[in-house]
Amino acid sequence: MLNSLYSGNRLRVDFSNVAKEIDVPNLLQLQKKSFDHFLNLDNSQTESGIEKVFKSIFPIHDPQNRLTLEYVSSEISKPRYTVRECMERGLTYCVNLKIKIRLIVHDRDEKTSEKVGVKDIKEQEIFVREIPLMTDRISFIINGVERVVVNQLHRSPGVIFKEEESPTVVNKLIYTAQIIPDRGSWLYFEYDTKDVLYVRINKRRKVPITILFRALGYKKQDIVKLFYPIQTLNIKNNKFLTMFNPDDFSGRVDYDIKDEDGNILHQAGKRLTKKKADKLIEDGLKFVEYPIEVLVNRYLASPVIDKESGEVIYDTLTQLDENKLAKIVAEQNSIEIANDLASGVDDAIINSFLQDYETLKLLKQTEGLEDENDLAAIRIYKVMRPGEPVVKEAARTFVNDLFFNPERYDLTKVGRMKMNHKLGLSVPEYVTVLTNEDIIKTAKYLIKVKNGQGYIDDRDHLGNRRIRSIGELLANELHLGFVKMQKAIRDKFTSLSNNVDELMPYDLVNPKMITTTIMEFFTGGQLSQFMDQTNPLSEVTHKRRLSALGEGGLVKERAGFEVRDVHPTHYGRICPVETPEGQNIGLINTLSTYAKVNDLGFVESPYRRVIDGKVTNEIVYLTATQEEGHIIAPASTVLDANDIIKEDLIEVRRDGEMLLAKREDVTLIDLCSGMVMGVAASLIPFLEHDDANRALMGSNMQRQAVPLLRSTAPIVGTGMEAIVARDAWEAIKAKRGGVIEKVDNRNIFILGEDENGPYIDQYTMEKNLRTNQNTTFSQHPIVKKGDMVKSGQIIADGSSMEKGELAIGKNALIAFMPWNGYNYEDAIVMSERMIRADAFTSVHIYEKEIEARELKDGVEEITRDIPNMKEEDLMHLDESGIVKIGTHIKPGMILVGKVSPKGEVKPTPEERLLRAIFGEKAGHVVNKSLYAGASLEGVVIDVKIFTKKGYEKDARSFKAYEDEKNILEKEHHDRLLMLDREEMLRVTALLSKNPLESELEIGKNSYKKGDKIKRSDLDNVNRFTLNTYVKCFSKEIQKTYEDMKAYFQNEKKKLKDEHDAKLEILEKDDILPSGVVKLVKVYLATKRKLKVGDKMAGRHGNKGIVSNIVPDVDMPYLPNGRTVDIVLNPLGVPSRMNIGQILESHLGLVGMKLGEQIEEIFENKKAEWIKELRAKMTEIADVSRLMDAKAILSKIDDDKLIDYARDWASGVRFATPIFEGVKADEFKKLFEMAKIDMDGKTELYDGRTGSKMAERVNVGCMYMLKLHHLVDEKVHARSTGPYSLVTQQPVGGKALSGGQRFGEMEVWALEAYGAAHTLREMLTVKSDDVEGRLAAYKALTRGENVPSTGIPETFFVLTNELKSLALDVEIYDEEENNE
């Protein structure tokens, strides 16, 4: 059982009902596993993704049989720069791919041009540069920007059968089948309204299906025998006789059953029972008469041949009539007909033959061919490539290449598996092209479906949709790049002259095509996205996202309701809650918490196996297809002590349907109740009490919570907080266990011991980094020197983390009550105390950059010498013209000074005079400095300067280089010291464990032969003395010691090489885009306190805007004098139906009150107070169901217990997993322990008057988040600014410095008030009256009255549009009209 009182590095009381059998799988394993397999980083025995791509393209043959280009092997280099260096320098974190290519030059026969031998073999290594490499964070750094490749949820390759309503005929269903490959032509089979079966290739014109079969080489007679049961009719006494088969008479009999003599054995219209049929067979009935009226209009299955001449009288598929039948009776003994009346078949194939007859007849005349198979191939060629001339050989090759050529067509292993499963085939899985059998079986199954014997597929079933993760997506892109390269190589082959002996592989292969294709995917692909780094949760969920969009996926404008809807197969696989609001709803989803993706890309869900009503501990992961037919009980099913289901009848699921079943019939049970939801939804406590719409908002808004200055984990959690922190890269986890040796601001060192002896591991923490969303990222240690840590334990928190748990907000004391109308419409009233305490303060880092470029008139210069600037405006710049670190920046201040050369113009005498006085420079340069924007205020925390090779570095660059070098030197020194310490520990451990071979004296202690030296005697001995001591040990120990020395010598050499490589990168000239000579990046940290207008939310979709920040003395207060922190509107609860927030506030209040009781014990510190503390904590923890709290807490030592109790003093932490929340009786017990009234309400007093509130108020503790919709980034004003080019109206939006839209409804408001002058002003001078606004501006600047308005530009736009419709529009003014 994995349920534990521990959560991260703290204790949390867990209320789970069901014992946890397995831990939540690593949340990011899908992407890592997929990419590692692509580059074979997992060293698996199976063929890697990149190898498959190479083998699908190579070898490439010369059409003239002179050359062959083969792939030999590939190798991946190490990345040149670290992740951090790539982000700072704007580079791509990548590796180079080294491909070994072999060129074989063949000897040819001069006459036949056939290969007769090998003339020469040449091998060469070719570099494919910049293959992006996945970082440890499961992201990619592309041009300095961190990106994520989202998993694609797409249609699985294979065969799918559908039915749709006919668009032309009412109440008619059209049946279709599709064979969908991963690469190649799609094949569609479809019935039309007249029940003719057609086929389409790639949505081109349809052709009768028989054309395709003929093109595949089948004769008419073969096709008929494939699709129809053949009925043989013997002719005797001018009658047609057929074998008596009871299966032909299922249902009511259509005609009298007569024996050979004409005796009626069974009348028409009556049902032929099995008993009666058996009786007839017993009585010796073999043949029955086949009536001529049933035979008329039937079709021959084989030709009727004249016995004497051997001529064909009637060909296959001749329609029979009475005259033909009379002739047949006279001349033949028997005939074969296609039995289209048999069960499960219809006349679709016969109708297709009738349709293709005219087509082939016409082609016979135009092409001059008789062979119908060749004509069918030509017909398909003409449909696919209309207008192109064709010969029969080319047509046959074309048809073969469409479906049977591995280079052009690939079903993949998945598609083959789906085909075999659906059609009952046994084709080997390595055959990933179509076979004739595939096509025939698909057509047969479609006919069965049409005739009620097959099953329609559900395209939204997760058995028909699969996940393409990063490895597969990259392999597809790489394949596209190689296909382009393959085409270019083949073109080069054809253009080569006869002299091919001197040719090398590099002359043929152009790797740029591959690099370009891959970089296009990463920079412009729909699935490669700018990573959401607002907080650790947003990052984790972004990497777990499934998108139905992207190349080969759906288009959101055309996606219907069905594909977006929640499907029964999503249960435990795809989260039904977490999806965006808006036009992407249902198209972008998230994996459920416990879901895994198998090697074929299908999502699996975990279940426990049930045998005869007993729940076993065997856990199975099943795909949606494997789950079919299973009877599955929910996790909430009541079990007895022996894990046997208690109830005889229980509610279960089978194939998405809810039904009652006996316990003996149950085959599986859900692993846990929460497995149905995704990570973000699993973080919402009491989710089961929230409306689905609000749960959706809640899970989405948690991803928007900004990291606060001091985040705290929720008092009321769900247990998922520690799981998210465990798998997010932001936290540092110990790779190996041990004791904390040293902790400082930057590093943590862990000393441990394994089978090889002692070791020291170093972990480096990141500080004040900017994320993609401009939030701050810093890591801080949560361990201290001397602490014991286990492998995998979190030793340093990232942003939005506390004690190894996710912490995206603050616990606040809230009251549900109106407060003077300030919390109308979900507005939030906040206490000033929260702002003073920096409770919701966040730090944001902004990056500003400026480039100095090479221009035709000269080079731009970063300088402090800026024309027309006062000295006081430049005081904060250094001598290089760059802002100093630590400067407090205000809007409008210069960050980096830059001057740009003006074009050379002949100076006027005045300018010559100015130049003579003020120097040469001032005249012909212009100020192009980088200024702080209107809303930008903060402190400069870092500056990065990059200079191109060949250009002089400034003093600031040299200083930055020295600082960086000193940091590297210090790091290197620290690591060497730790390596020395590790070496000494290993040596002392070795010497203290083994006996001496001769006598030895250490200080005052003397040791005899066979003694073991005390470790304490060796601790203070230096390295050189140890060398002499080693000689007193056996040869084996001496050899081990020498090996150890050599190992550490090698490690030091590696450290030195690594350090030298870093210094080399530091000293190298920076890589900058062409034309850029210098790049300066300035980083500013801005402190954003909570303000009126900021958006806040709880975890239940209860969002609102801060409307008022009230002095804490005016806020409502409790009887003990404590003021509430936040006042929320009670009307926000009933209509939104998110009752979870009420329950959360109740449990949060319990946590706070119990915390106060623990704090009281700390304050009083009576005798044996630690014992009292332990007893109190045990009493609280005993409320949970599955934990033996007493056993756990009794094992914790006093110091650790005090640490945990201090944490609980600020609020006892609870975990209430989703669907397993705290029950009513447990709430009562907790309320009694916390001494809270049973209604959960309390008396409140008005802070302003001191009077008691009329009603008791629901006061509790709720976890509140500050979202990244900050008012500081939204407030915007404009006086004048840019105008739209066509309409001449002000543009919109803050980014463009736009105006406020005065829309149609606002115009109505002014019309209603009769404010005519204001209205005219709004629609003219303040909008698009170009002359009027210019005149108004002049009048205002001169202090004159504003003149009358003119005609708005919109009027002219309208008249021009009318003119474009060929309408003559003339404008008359009033005076002309009067005349």
Swiss-Prot record:
GO biological process, any: DNA-templated transcription
A GO CC annotation given for this chain: DNA-directed RNA polymerase complex
Record's keyword terms, sorted: DNA-directed RNA polymerase, Nucleotidyltransferase, Transcription, Transferase
Matching InterPro entries: DNA-dir_RNA_pol_bsu_ext_1_sf (IPR042107), DNA-dir_RNA_pol_bsu_external_1 (IPR019462), DNA-dir_RNA_pol_su2 (IPR015712), DNA-dir_RNAP_su2_dom (IPR007120), DNA-dir_RNAP_su2_hyb_sf (IPR037033), RNA_pol_bsu_bac (IPR010243), RNA_pol_bsu_CS (IPR007121), RNA_pol_bsu_protrusion (IPR007644)
Catalysed reaction, written as an equation: RNA(n) + a ribonucleoside 5'-triphosphate = RNA(n+1) + diphosphate
Entry's family note: Belongs to the RNA polymerase beta chain family.
NCBIfam families documented for this protein: PRK00405.1, rpoB
Protein task: DNA-dependent RNA polymerase catalyzes the transcription of DNA into RNA using the four ribonucleoside triphosphates as substrates.
Name of the protein: DNA-directed RNA polymerase subunit beta
